[in-house]
Amino acid sequence: MRRGPRVALVLGLLRIYLAQANFAPHFFDNGVGSTNGNMALFSLPEDTPVGSHVYTLNGTDPEGDPISYHISFDPSTRSVFSVDPNFGNITLVEELDREREDEIEAIISISDGLNLVAEKVVILVTDANDEAPRFIQEPYIIRVPENIPAGSSIFKVQAEDKDTGSGGSVTYSLQNLHSSKFSMDRHSGVLRLQAGATLDYEKSRAHYITVIAKDGGGRLRGADMVFSATTTVTINVEDVQDTAPIFVGTPYYGYVYEDTLPGSEVLTVVAIDGDRGKPNHILYRLLNESDGIFEINETSGAISVLQSPALLRREVYELHVQVTEVNSPGSPAAQATVPVTIRIVDLNNHPPTFYGESGPQNKFELSMFEHPPQGEILRGLKITVNDSDQGANAKFNLRLVGPGGIFRVVPQTVLNEAQVTIIVENSAAIDFEKSKLLTFKLLAIEVNTPEKFSSTADIVIQLLDTNDNVPKFTSHYYIARIPENAPGGSNVVAVTAVDPDTGPWGKVHYSIYGTGSDLFLIHPSTGLIYTQPWASLDAEGTSRYNFYVKAEDMDGRYSLAEVFVTLLDVNDHYPQFVQSVQEKTMVLGTPLKIEATDQDAEEPNNLVDYSITRAEPVNVFDIDAHTGEIRLKNSIRSLEALHNITPSGDYSWSLQVQAKDRGSPSFSTTALLKIDITDTERLSRGSMAAFLIQTKDNPMKAVGVLAGVMAIVVAITVLISTATFWRNKKSNKVLPVRRVLRRRPSPAPHTVRIEWLKFRRAKAATKFILKEDSPNENCNNSRVGVMVPPRAPALPPPPKMASSMVAQQTVPTVSGSLTPQPSPQLPTPKTLGGPVQSSLVSELKQKFEKKSLDNKAYI
């Protein structure tokens, strides 16, 4: 029952680890007019047919994993697009209408199965000429006095077109071209009485004029379309009466476009005499000062602009025009005033522009330390953005284009001008070791204009390093092997740690410590480990060392690695004969065995081969080269055969045996073995000797007999002790018995000088004749005094001899001797010719030599 949650927890942790090790996919940025990328700066005409393929999302995954695309919309809005998750093809599924919705917000995302990256995009809906002009404030019925001056403004019609650009610009014209009394300004829609034309109340009290409003045309579904609308203006002619001047066509609104030339006429104020009789002349003048920007014609009432509108800072100017009737002298002049509103119409002819401290600038650079605090402002960037247009034409958005989520820009929407502030969003992503240079584009794009003017500025951030990294070894452990006879100061292994930081922070200092580091040193700068100058390595004493190395930077940040050093055995020991026996007796058909040991640590240096180097006579004995067993030749099957081999006819033999190891160079030792040969019939004279000979091939029988004897001795001892105890108890006296056991001192070793003996005829029991410093028949004093080659420190004493070997030593008839004689040639110690090859160091698999590690623990 408990295994399920544990498995789920392990799978969850594994999934988190894999997600952290997996880098997120990202979109490709697209430029203006591109239909492939992340939909930045993407716009779509409103007349695009439903079902059209309008865009292709395009991105990539750093690991090359399969990616999928998605698009979503706010629940309160329409789902205008659909996307193919595999290929990123975006299809229009809802009809567009710019007049109702001029931009569409959507969230596009890209996923590699583990990571999901989402971006919010704004798709701009561009205009198509799908709207016709529409007259406002209909019907148009006006009253005009009959004495209105020729060229005067009579009325102003107004039509609007919801389209933008040329499709939203309206021009006016008259349909009844046969009528020559009236004309219309094609841009302003002002209806005027043509020059030279007059109105006559008596002849015609009303005039009907058809006005056509036509847009500038535009593209609609692939074709050029022009829409128009018509209306009728009814002009009722009034009889002139004796009244004050009357303004015609009020209210007065004038529009001056930004590209209008100085001196151009803006509008005409028309005032007439209200009298029905003979009209008086009207004079016009401006009551308020216009700062020299506008002037009015005294007689016609035409208002003109004197300065370039592009230089004007105000958007609206309010003027007051006064008209005065020119009467006969002495008559009071009738006057009237009217307000005139003139609006400066801004043309969207300025894109947003970035400014630095010295003027317009499209590249801004900054140096800063890595990992700044979250929310910190990049105060080194002095950026101002400005759009010289007015009103809606000067409204634009700001955004950063580049690696997402690192910085954000404030403000995001600007009207005319703003100071740009860039704030840190993701401090961890600002990493000197990952990227020394961060590059972004600061994008300013207009919001509510059909042109969508935009500009960009490059933001280049040069990162400065800080000590934010720990030195790391290239491996968690290092393994080296060096010969045991390497001289002091020999190179062992070079460890390497890397600190990604730069300058002093990236310098690594190495040190060494641990229980196995006494014999080693490390170079603090290079990481080279070498032996102490006085170090003497011995594989037979300690063959393996392990210790730790430390890599530390100047601020104390450090990491550790473990070093394993294995000493390679060198053949620096002679074989040594184990048994110190002078004589032996060989029973016909039973081999003798000699044994020598080599204290080298590894094969083949400690493997010993045996051979007979000298014998008199020859061709009597054979020796097994691997086990050291000595046998008679197969042709010798009886004592009589032996008796006839030599002139002396005896059964005593002398052999010189050599023990030679398999190392390179090879060392050897010789020993002299004296053998008496007998048979089982002669051994039957001694019961103990016969028993030992019989049980030689069955040692368990000897052990059983020995155990029985010991049991009997113990039983007798217990009985005697019990009887003594009860006797003393009856006499109320217990006498302690104290036995002092002393170990017999071992006899001092002495040198035995053995001469080669001539064989002579004797009885079978006759011994060899020896010449020695002090005659001794039972001790091994046959060691020849020659110089011993240098060798490693002594190993612990060898294990005790097996019981079978002891049994052989106790045979009463043993009369042979074994005399080790080392080879006169001394070994030449091996030295390292150079540093240990790095290929040996890199053999990491040596750490896993489990068989060796299980058998030999590190010291």
Curated annotation (Swiss-Prot):
Region (Disordered) location: 793-838
Secretion signal span: 1-21
GO biological process annotation, one example: photoreceptor cell morphogenesis
UniProt subcellular location: Cell membrane
Tissues where this protein is expressed: Expressed in cone and rod photoreceptor cells (at protein level). Expressed in photoreceptor cells of the outer nuclear layer of the retina. Expressed in mitral and tufted cells in the olfactory bulb.
Record's comment on post-translational modification: Undergoes proteolytic cleavage; produces a soluble 95 kDa N-terminal fragment and a 25 kDa cell-associated C-terminal fragment.
Gene3D superfamilies referenced in this protein's UniProt entry, alphabetically: Cadherins
Molecular function per GO: calcium ion binding
Disruption phenotype: Mice have no obvious phenotype but show photoreceptor cell death as early as 1 month of age shortly after completion of retinal development. Its absence severely compromises the structure of OS which are disorganized and fragmented, but the consequences on photoreceptor electrical signaling are very mild. Proteolytic cleavage is partially inhibited in the absence of orderly OS assembly in mouse retinas lacking RDS/peripherin.
Chain ranges on the Cytoplasmic side, renumbered to this chain: 723-859
Protein name in the entry: Cadherin-related family member 1
Domain Cadherin: residue ranges: 36-135, 136-247, 248-354, 360-473, 474-577, 569-691
Record key words, sorted: Calcium, Cell adhesion, Cell membrane, Glycoprotein, Membrane, Receptor, Repeat, Signal, Transmembrane, Transmembrane helix
